[in-house]
From Swiss-Prot:
This is DNA-directed RNA polymerase I subunit RPA49. It holds the Pfam family RNA_pol_I_A49. It is found in: Nucleus, Nucleolus. GO terms for cellular component: fibrillar center; nucleolus; nucleoplasm; RNA polymerase I complex. GO terms for biological process: nucleolar large rRNA transcription by RNA polymerase I; RNA polymerase I preinitiation complex assembly. Acetylated at Lys-436 by CREBBP/CBP, leading to decreased RNA polymerase I transcription. In normal conditions, deacetylated by SIRT7, promoting the association of RNA polymerase I with the rDNA promoter region and coding region. In response to stress, SIRT7 is released from nucleoli leading to hyperacetylation of POLR1E/PAF53 and decreased association of RNA polymerase I with the rDNA promoter region. The modification Phosphoserine is found at residue 226. It comes from Mus musculus. Component of the RNA polymerase I (Pol I) complex consisting of 13 subunits: a ten-subunit catalytic core composed of POLR1A/RPA1, POLR1B/RPA2, POLR1C/RPAC1, POLR1D/RPAC2, POLR1H/RPA12, POLR2E/RPABC1, POLR2F/RPABC2, POLR2H/RPABC3, POLR2K/RPABC4 and POLR2L/RPABC5; a mobile stalk subunit POLR1F/RPA43 protruding from the core and additional subunits homologous to general transcription factors POLR1E/RPA49 and POLR1G/RPA34. Forms a heterodimer with POLR1G/RPA34. Interacts with POLR1G. Also binds UBTF/UBF. Interacts with PWP1. InterPro entries: RNA_pol-assoc_fac_A49-like. Keywords: Acetylation, DNA-directed RNA polymerase, Nucleus, Phosphoprotein, Transcription. Belongs to the eukaryotic RPA49/POLR1E RNA polymerase subunit family.
Length: 482
């Protein structure tokens, strides 16, 4: 037979507490002064494992008149290893305090009543000692300003710097006892640069990615230092062997050679202008014969065809002007038509950056001319897993020099550099630089435009004997520096 036992005193007490919890009610204790809000803290570099090991101190602003500063509060926390500081003002303060409200509730388990108080959240950041931190007394007995910066010999200047940074939110203001302030950082830290101090912080608290980047940078630094040392020793050995004057002379000679790499063969001792830059060096006999069919339209061009070219903008203005003055003689007309066609091809070819495909200018170009353009006026590069023909800046200069020579042979060894420069999309300074390197005589001439205005053009003339060779502006500047 089962017996029914009455509950004991412990069970009665537990039921009373359960009933109280089930019927708990909360009581808001009103909006206190900002200086009396409860303090909630969070740590920026991790979670708190042993709350009992932390020693917290709360500091309130002593300025009760200024409404902006009277609510300023600073929370300091100490452990055996680190100190932490958090404040509710400046750029380091949490924005959530202004956007939302925090509360702390204290539950009385006996009465079932929870008292709710306003709270404020602080973000605690570690404060590193002995990292070259300047301590400046701002006023009062215990108010100081701490900031991470490079040590300054002049304490007054450092104070001005820190005050300006404090207004920008780059400093931390804390309240400390005079005995807790270390006036002089250790000697080993005084010799450290700001970069070294930042690297120490990354070593201690940086992420895996930051530490990996730091190790890579240090390894590269060691490698670059070794390389610089080796280069310096090699340079000293060469200077001791050859001498400074010989090295400067070699450098100037290299500059002169680099400057004429883009020029075609020049015969400076030629007796006639047509022999200085020979036509056969621009177009070989085989290439000249291959232009018979493509240049037929230019050879048979009429005034109506020229007007149509102008309307359709199918050819550049310099080519159209050359077509207007084709000679009547069949032999000379044929030669100039082929030269003008190749000049037009060079101008269109230079406007490109990368040649995609095997055809430089599309269909209709003779194979020998297409091969000439790709081999003589492009550089072979490797990009995105495939080879490409690139028209580099030096190749553009080479195309410009060949275009000038063709224009000289077409127009009795005088070329309108300004008109040709516009079609080549080139600056006047660069055009004159190339023309001078080709040893042309530069002159000015007024040219009448279609609307009646006059424009000053630069003309380049090839005449013998050739004027002295002139270096480019870049080489002249380099020679002056040497």
């Amino acid at each position: 037979m089962a017996t029914l036992e009455s509950p004991g005193m412990d069970d009665q007490a537990g039921d009373t507490e359960t009933e109280a919890l089930q019927s708990a009610r909360w009581l808001y204790c009103g909006e206190p002064d900002d200086r009396q809000k409860a303090v909630l803290v969070q740590f920026s570099n991790g979670k708190l494992q042993n709350p009992g090991d932390m020693r917290f101190t709360l500091y309130n602003s002593t300025d009760l008149v200024n409404p902006r500063q009277r609510s300023h509060r600073i929370v300091a926390a100490e452990t055996d290893r680190l100190s932490y500081v958090g404040n509710n003002f400046g750029t380091g303060a949490l924005k959530c305090n202004a956007l939302c409200r925090h509360f702390v509730g204290i539950l009385n388990k006996t009465s079932g009543q929870m008292e709710v108080y306003d709270a404020e959240l602080f973000n605690m950041q570690p404060l590193f000692a002995g990292m070259g931190t300047e301590v400046i007394k701002l006023g009062g007995q215990h108010l100081y300003l701490l900031a991470f910066c490079q040590p300054s010999k002049n304490l007054a200047e450092a104070g001005d710097l820190l005050l300006s940074r404090h207004r920008q939110g780059h400093c931390i203001a804390v309240l400390l006892d005079d005995d807790a302030i270390e006036r002089e950082p250790p000697l080993e830290n005084q010799n450290k640069t700001f970069r070294d101090k930042l690297d120490s912080c990354i070593e201690a608290f940086g992420s895996t990615k930051q530490k990996r980047s730091l190790n890579s940078r240090r390894m590269n630094k060691v490698g670059s230092e070794s390389l610089n040392l080796s280069v310096a020793k090699a340079a000293e050995s060469i200077i001791d062997t050859k001498g400074v004057n010989a090295l400067v002379s070699d450098a100037m000679q290299d500059d002169l050679q680099d400057g004429v790499l883009y020029l075609p063969p020049c015969y400076a001792d030629a007796a006639k202008p047509e022999d200085v830059y020979r036509f056969e060096d621009i177009l070989s006999p085989a290439e000249y014969d291959a232009l018979e069919s493509p240049s037929e339209a230019f050879r048979k061009v009429t005034s109506e065809d020229i007007l149509k070219m102008i309307e359709e903008n199918s050819h550049c203005s310099y080519v159209i002007e050359m077509l207007k003055s084709l000679p009547i003689d069949e032999v000379h007309r044929n030669r100039q038509a082929r030269s003008i066609w190749f000049l037009d091809a060079l101008i269109r070819f230079r406007a490109q950056k990368v040649i995609k495909g095997k055809r430089a200018l599309g269909p209709g170009i003779p194979h020998i001319i297409n091969t000439k353009l790709l081999k003589q006026f492009t550089c072979l590069t490797y990009n995105n897993g495939r080879l490409q023909n690139l028209i580099s800046s030096s190749m553009r200069a080479k195309i410009t020099s060949y275009a000038i020579i063709l224009a000289l042979h077409i127009n009795n060894f005088q070329v309108d550099l300004t008109a040709l420069q516009k079609d080549l999309k080139l600056s006047e300074k660069r055009m004159i630089e190339i023309a001078k390197a080709m040893r042309l005589k530069i002159s000015k001439q007024k040219v009448s435009l279609a609307d009646g205005r006059e424009e000053s053009h630069r003309l380049g003339t090839l005449s013998v004997p050739l004027p002295p060779a002139q270096n480019s502006d870049r080489q002249s500047k380099r020679r002056k520096m040497n």
